[in-house]
Amino acid sequence: MVKLVLTEDETMLADSARGFLDKSAPVKAFRDLRDAGQTHDAKMWKEMAAMGWAGVLVPESAGGVDMGHAAAGILAQEMGKTLAVSPFLSTAVIAATALRHVSDARAEAALAKIASGDATYAL
């Protein structure tokens, strides 16, 4: 059965994300990045990584927080509200999910770089 109400932890995550994004990623920031031809704000991505967002789907053994897809969805929803420009979906969700299905040292190293915010992926 699908749950319709966020847990207390999920609500705290959403509130925290909303507070950060309201300050760090207003719609004006999106327009500025677009006009400058930039793909994302690298400084903001490092801040997101420091909060564990880049490692939301990365196993703890690789330096992630492994909070699951529900948490990733909450973060994506909050990012969408401010039009935050980040490599979150391509890197923290898609690449991390794909790399979790590979069991070798290269995948583990790549996951660690995702969690730290040192690598971004485009698929």
Per-region residue spans from a language model:
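Short, flexible segments with low predicted structural confidence
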Residues: 2, 19-20
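Glycine-rich flavin
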Residues: 22, 26-123
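Glycine-rich phosphate/cofactor-binding loops in nucleotide/flavin-utilizing enzymes
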Residues: 2-3, 14, 74, 94
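Intrinsic disorder at enzyme termini
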Residues: 1-9
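Short alpha-helical segments used as structural interaction elements across diverse proteins
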Residues: 7, 15, 28-31
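A non-catalytic, amphipathic alpha-helix used as a structural packing/dimerization or gating element
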Residues: 12, 16-19
